[in-house]
C-alpha cells in the first residue's frame, strides 16, 4: 500500500539474528492490519513506532484531542500498540506522573479490559509520596487489588519470580534528564530483567524538561552506583526513550544482553521544545525552576549545605547556619517528602534563587558550590559525605578541584573532551530533530 509523510507506521531497528523470525512475523502482522511500514536497521534490538496508523483503533476510552502544536506523549498514543496488548499479561512500571490527561495509565489499561497483573514502583513509590532515599514497601493497591511490587526496597531489579506471570512490561515514568535521578537506573534494571527472562518491554516516551543542553563530567566506571550507572554527563540531553535505545545499543546491560524494546515516541516535540511538567516528578521537584536548578544544586546533597528540603522551596534555595548573615533566611522542618531534611530546625542564612529571572538553565552553574565553599572555608565543614559526592559527580576529581580552589571556568574546561565524545555516541539514538 502507499505510504504518506503524515500517515504511516515506521519501524526503526538493527538487524539482530535472534529476533529475525520475530521481526518477520511482526512485519506480516502489520501488513495484514493495512498499515504502512518502513524498515530502518539502526537500533540494536529496538523497535521505534513512529507515526499514525491509517485509522484510530476503536476502544472504549476517550481519544485525546490536541492542537497541532501540543506535544503528544507516548502515553497519549496508546492506540499505536493497544491491539498487541490484548491477551497479554501486563506489568507496568509507573508512578504518579503516569497520566493520560487526568487518568492514570493503570486505570486506562484496566478500562480497556487489558490484563494488568502487577505494578512495579520506583523510588518515591507508586503515588510519589515517599521521601528521597526511603525504602518503598511492596503492597496491594486498595483501589484495584493489583500487587504493587517495590523496585526500591529489598531489591531494585525485578526477579525471575516477579516476571514469571508477565508477558510484557510497560515503562511510563516522567524523567528530568539528570544522571543522578534514579528512574534511569530503575529502567536499566527492568530492561536487564526483561532481557534475562525473555520478556518484551515498551517505553512510553515523555519530553525531557532539561533536554535542551548537555553538561557535566562523564561518569567513570569506578563510581557506578544507583545514582549513576552509565558513562554519561550529569545532563545528557535525551528523552527516556532515547536513553533506553542507548542502553541497548551501547551494550550497557549485564553480559551485553539486548532487551526486546519498543519505544512509543512523542509527537510535535523536539529537544528545544519547552515543556512544563503538569505533575511534580518527585516530592521535592515541585516547580519549573526547581527542575531547572536540580542539576546545579543536587551536588549539595553530599554537603552540609541545605538546598531547601523541608521548606516550601526545595531546590530553589541554598543556605547554611554558618554562612554570614544574609537578607534571606530559612529553617527546614520535617514535612511531606522530606522526613529528615538537612539542617532541620536550624536557621540557615542563604540565597533565594527564585528571584532570578532565568527560569531555564543552559549549563550547570558551579558558582553556587564555589560560593558555598568560599563562605564555609573548611572543606570538612563543606563536603561531609565525600564518597557520596564522588558518586554524584561521577568521579573523584571534582571534589579535589573544589578543595584546591579551582574556578568554574577551570573546572568546566576539563569536561570538554568527554562531552564531545558523548555527543558522538548520543547522536546515534536521537529520535527528535
PLM features: what roles do these ranges have?
Residues 267-344:
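Glycine-rich, aromatic-lined ligand/substrate-binding cores of catalytic
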Residues 117-124:
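Short internal beta-strands
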Residues 128-133, 202-224:
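Glycine-rich, charge-decorated loop segments at or immediately adjacent to ligand/cofactor-binding or catalytic sites
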Residues 314-414:
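Conserved functional hotspot residues or short segments at active or partner-binding sites
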Residues 31-32:
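C-terminal motif of bacterial Sec signal peptides marking the signal peptidase cleavage site
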Residues 224-294:
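Conserved anion/nucleotide-ligand pocket segment
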Residues 136-165, 178:
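Glycine-rich oxoanion-binding loops at beta->alpha junctions
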Residues 175-187:
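Glycine/threonine-rich flexible loop motifs
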